[in-house]
Amino acid sequence: MLGIAAAMLAVSATQNTARANCRPDGQDDNIMRNAILSEMIAKQQTCQLDSRPHKVLCIGNSITLHLPSNAVNWYSSQGMAASKPELDYCHVLEKLMRQHNRKTTVTPVNIADWERNPSLSLDSLLRDKCQGKDIIVIRIGENVQPDGVANFEKNLAALIDYCKGFTGKIVLTGEYWPHVQKELAIVRNAHKYGLRYVPIDWIWNLYREECSPKEGDTLYDVNGKPYTIKGQFILTHPNDKGMELIAKSIYSIL
């Protein structure tokens, strides 16, 4: 697996792929993003977890947790498209962190509705989940709609401010599906608040084939019964390998 520095370099090297998703002046966004990243990577060192039990909250979307939905032929309750709960990135992250303390827990929460409609109350969505957590991972952005991209930086800042009311240790990940403007909004917030940040779009850019599920692949439903992937919605999400790389990327900077 690529290290954090190598991953950031990979992101910079694959910007042409991401540019298709940004506005005409996206090249300026790339220059700004890389300048901020260069400063951040010089300061950002791998942190060694202590032996205390940690309570981690992963705030995300369908990549973090998706409940069963007949509408998209998804009958599981984990990060989409992990084949089993224990193989999504939150469970893999928990397993990695339990090497330091077996009582560490990682809890997922899906706020995709807030991504699409940031006027929703964060307190209603997150208060109970955030209570008692000492690490919060914010892993969002893919569901921000085109008309919401311009305000994503401001809305993400509001989410960070809310989470800071519960813990000072907040980690931001980048986008899984490359999008330069959204990524820059995340990087700027990480820089502004002095937060740890890890890009993950290099997984999609460099390892899309091996990290994406295929139609007909086997998944397991909430009762452990196998079923096969049908339809396009699940196919764009990370499979077990992609989930593992996301988990290891987050773990490497905790």
Segments predicted by a language model, with ranges:
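N-terminal secretory targeting modules
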Residues: 1-59, 63-82, 99, 179, ...
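Generic low-polarity alpha-helical segments
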Residues: 1-17, 89, 114-115, 128-136, ...
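Detector for Asparagine
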Residues: 16, 21, 30, 34, ...
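Short, charge-rich amphipathic segments
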Residues: 22-35, 85-97, 118-127, 177-188
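Conserved SGNH/GDSL esterase-like catalytic core that processes O-acyl groups on lipids
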Residues: 39-40, 50, 55-57, 65-149
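Extended amphipathic secondary-structure runs
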Residues: 104-109, 114, 243-254
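Alpha-helical cap/lid subdomain in secreted, periplasmic
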Residues: 120-253
